[in-house]
């Protein structure tokens, strides 16, 4: 049974019980418990699994973040690190979602999701890394996501304390940033963007 299961589900880097039921309409979920004890599978969170033969790479973690809480896309600190904006690595997968804010502590790391308004769920793209495809905020959108939900970024000094890479920030498409900014319709965000601009070109 397991060999057949593995052959079919190997097409899914991360699979849900719903994925399993589509492939195996009559499936005893007790098998999942048994296979975990045999170290064939690892449960990420309720209803989501991956095979223990999987190599845990960055692309896999990004893909997993999208899969286990959908709709969502990689954003905030994780995306800033991906684009080289922040100097240090991150130890938690951070995403934007239109669902409620939550966090999952799993055997492969922490996955944090921050709620944004449904009308702000845009500005992401699909890219490939380590053979995995996933949704990640565009550079301009991750900047706005970050500023929108961080009230403390209210001065040039607050950005200086973050040590964001100015040379990478200069790669921002400022026309796109401005267009996206209008969709937020937030005076507070506009002020934070102004502080960011002063920081970049100080």
Tell where the protein language model's regions lie, with residue ranges:
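Short beta-edge/loop segments at beta->alpha junctions of small alpha/beta modules
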Residues: 1-71
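Nucleic-acid-binding surface
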Residues: 18-19, 52-202
């Amino acid at each position: 049974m397991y060999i057949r299961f593995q052959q079919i589900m190997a097409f899914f880097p991360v699979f849900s019980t719903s994925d399993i039921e589509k492939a195996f309409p009559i499936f005893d979920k007790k098998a999942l418990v048994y296979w975990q004890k045999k170290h064939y599978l690892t449960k990420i969170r309720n209803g989501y699994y991956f095979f223990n033969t999987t190599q845990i790479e960055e692309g896999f973690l990004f893909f997993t973040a999208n899969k286990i809480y959908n709709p969502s896309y990689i954003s905030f600190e994780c995306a800033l690190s991906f684009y080289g904006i922040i100097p240090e690595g991150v130890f938690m997968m951070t995403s934007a979602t239109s669902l409620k804010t939550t966090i999952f502590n799993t055997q492969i790391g922490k996955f944090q999701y921050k709620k944004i308004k449904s009308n702000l769920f845009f500005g992401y793209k699909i890219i490939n890394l380590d053979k995995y495809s996933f949704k990640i905020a565009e550079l301009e959108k991750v900047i706005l996501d970050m500023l929108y939900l961080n009230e403390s970024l209210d001065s040039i000094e607050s950005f200086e304390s973050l040590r964001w890479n100015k040379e990478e920030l200069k790669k921002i498409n400022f026309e796109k940033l401005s267009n996206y900014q209008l969709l937020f319709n937030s005076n507070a965000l506009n002020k934070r963007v102004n502080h960011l601009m002063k920081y970049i070109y100080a």
